[in-house]
Swiss-Prot record:
PROSITE patterns, alphabetized: AA_TRNA_LIGASE_I (PS00178)
Organism for this UniProt entry: Enterocytozoon bieneusi (strain H348) (Microsporidian parasite)
Span of the annotated motif 'HIGH' region: 45-55
GO CC terms, sorted: cytosol
Lipoprotein is among the record's keywords: no
InterPro entries: aa-tRNA-synth_I_CS, aa-tRNA-synth_Ia, Ile-tRNA-ligase, Ile-tRNA-ligase_type2, M/V/L/I-tRNA-synth_anticd-bd, Rossmann-like_a/b/a_fold, tRNAsynth_Ia_anticodon-bd, Val/Leu/Ile-tRNA-synth_edit
Protein name: Probable isoleucine--tRNA ligase, cytoplasmic
Subcellular location, record wording: Cytoplasm
EC number: 6.1.1.5
Binding of ATP, residues: 637
Family label: Belongs to the class-I aminoacyl-tRNA synthetase family.
Gene Ontology process terms (BP): isoleucyl-tRNA aminoacylation
Amino acid sequence: MSDKIIDFSKIEKDILKFWTENKIFELCNKLSQGREEYVFFDGPPFATGLPHYGHILSGTIKDIIGRFYYQKGFHVERRFGWDCHGLPVEYEIDKKFNITDRNQILKMGIDVYNHECRKIVQKYTNEWEETVIRMGRWVDFKGSYKTMDLEFMESIWFIFKELFKRNKIYRGFKIMPFSTACKTALSNFEASQNYKNVSDPSVLVTFKIINPKDVLHNYENNDIEIFFVAWTTTPWTLPANCALVINPDYEYAIFYINNNSKKLYIMLKNRIEVYFKQFCITTVILGKELIGVSYATLFNYYENYITRGFFKTIGGNFVTITDGSGIVHTAPAFGEEDYNIFLKLGLLKPDEIPPCHIDENGKFTIAMEKYVNVPINNDISLNGVYFKDADKIILQILKPHLIYNSRIVHSYPFCWRSDTPLLYKLIPNWFVKITDIREELLTQNKKINWIPETIKYKRFQNWLSNAKDWAISRNRFWGTPLPIWARYENEIYNYTDLICVGSIKELEDLTNTKITDLHREHIDQLLIEHNGKTYKRIEDVLDCWFESGSMPYAQNHLKGIKVNNSLIDKLDNINLNNAYLIKENFPADFIGEGLDQTRGWFYTLHVISTILFNSPAFKNVIVNGIVLAEDGKKMSKRLKNYPDPMNIFNKYGADALRMYLISSPVVEAENLRFNENGVKEILKTLLIPWYNTLVFYKECQIQNHNHTLLLDAWIESELNILINKVNIDMSEYKLNNILNYALDFIENLNNWYIRINRKELKNNGLYLKTIIKRFSIVMSAFVPFFSDYSYQIVCSDKISVHLEMIPEYKSINSDFNFIKCIIDGIRHLREKYKLKLKKTLKEVIIVLDNININKNLFEKYEAVIKSECNTLDIILNDINDYSISTIIKPNFKELNKNKNVIKEKLDIISKLTVNDIENIKNGTHDININELLIETYIKDIEYSGVFITLELF
């Protein structure tokens, strides 16, 4: 039957209407009340934009797991969530109102700005619900949580205060990835989400040594100048240069180039030849002898720092011999190692900002007209120039100081939201201490079942091993305000005297003010008077990832936890209305999201649960890859390189798309190039054959008594094999083989059971009804629409397949598969010798390795074999009557699993004889039977259990 005749989309819409009118999802939840809980956490999507294939993929995975475990007898709460705060929302508003500076927001008013943010969050709700419902996903939208809701925000305050009380929160200055478009710092895991290959300058810059005798103690020639040579890919940082770092343990060389011995240069000895073909080394000197040497500044704006020890060479072990010149230009305002070494040497105080010429817009704040000792065009100015655009101007200004000027292509981080280059800059921020809990994070990770497992031991473990303190404050407006009030005197915050607020009631008591909303416009003006001192709230808001990482507790309005040493004690001592929800719903049995969340939601969940409960937040996680366009590029609305998901739903149906996605490597963290033909193939191979089964069933009479057919036990055995395989794979959270299992069964059902028994089934299809019903139940988590359509055809007296439980697996012995192999073998020979089925055979000779055992079996199915193969006679012969030869080969697929012993085993296999096979089968040999490929031949014909010879008329 052609797929053009069958409108699967209409079938699905009819089923969807049936679900809605009969409230099937609500009925499932009602019927499962009181069962054991299967806990699922739904990662909240950002409430901006429309759902794409990535959302459909992860939503399909979540829906399948939820439906399946409901059918396994659990109560599964499937509550939707919305991530409402943060950069994604603010960035949309900034674009809408052409906001480029935070002063524009302050002029607009935080209340007006946040009102616009709230509106855009609510804008996409209906579109999201339409897509989620159409894809067949069952979630509770009415009971959904929003991170902007008052109770959720209050719970975030409580969690933050718990961390604060445990000394896990601190304020500090750190080099942070900063989004100049969003005007805020990002966390390290946000910065790692969007790397791109870019071309940047690769230059060697010279710094003139003020007193050459500091380097050459016998220096007497006043005509000679000596320069340190530093390599950089960021010329825009040179105006903030404060020192040059040299490795004290390396050998450096004084040399000249271009036969100009009047200008001497110093750099790492073994790096000179990387940049210069012709050079002459005059002196070799150890790095430690070059430390403390003063040099002339390139720019004169920070000369007042000279008296503090700036603009000298300092020692640092982070200087490597593998790149650059071995001398590192150091700008502590823009480099983590730069800043840390300045703190270590006491050149900067912990609360001091070093020289910095870039503002929050990423633009230069100083004009460069007064450049020292270099004549420049008066038209050149850097004031207001974007930092990445400044490189060309800086290089033009510094042309006399450049002895090497090239380009380099390297990976550079971009803002994950605005897609603009990140600026690494020293910024005051509030942090969660991570470095002192790394080992515990790694320990808790061992308790988690990751699908695929490689994520656990590679990507996530590596990230945890190198995790840095988490920057959780954002100098923004739309978010949960940081619940910290600092002593405030003379318009200056005193960060050593803080009050952390953990609930609405606590804030009401401290301010004597009724609180109805916790957003900035409602609480920024609230002052706390305590012990004669005034406290004012820190203006920052919390990172939205802190909110999503707290959702297991905040979604149920967590507050008032009392913490003891063990998880059970902690949960037993919770003192709040919804305490039982926390205890019953933590940790989650399952979560699932994309690969990028290993540094996002998975990570923040893990950090917060480890600190609060010394426990992982989830037990099992499926990590999916990225759905790309067919050309391998990122899906882009601008490029129009992918079909609209709604068009796919309308053309092929959601079931086909669901099965296409979960049967691909994308469910094991691999990328998928979306191909519409792949969706169409699901119709061709699964849904249309299944539909044809139902068409045949409608032609059958249903008698009250069941008439047993020869293949009933076999098809029931095949169904139970399917049930068992699905149960095993789903218990291991492996989805990508489900389609193959279903295809095997539908092939056996249609092309064997029904075809062979067509006449008998038409007279009584009662047993076929049972098989279709149970198959529909097994498949209902994966293809929810068509499974219910199928179920309702064979079970008109029942409500919905989704109220049924998965059938119990029963081990049923069936001998027909052996006969099936015989029939397939005969068909193969017909095809090989181009003998059509209508050509009747005189006889078929079948050679068996145990004729006595199999003779009765052949007698049982003799009529089936003759009919299926169109032969008049079947002759059985014994293998022992033939001369046979056996070839033993290594099974490299199995041997490659342990490459340490593969050479040794290959040597053993090369010496094996036929006499060794029995011992190998019995397990009394060094070689495992699975490590071999054993081929048997009769008269050069390959033997795989039976030989078949066709005798023609």
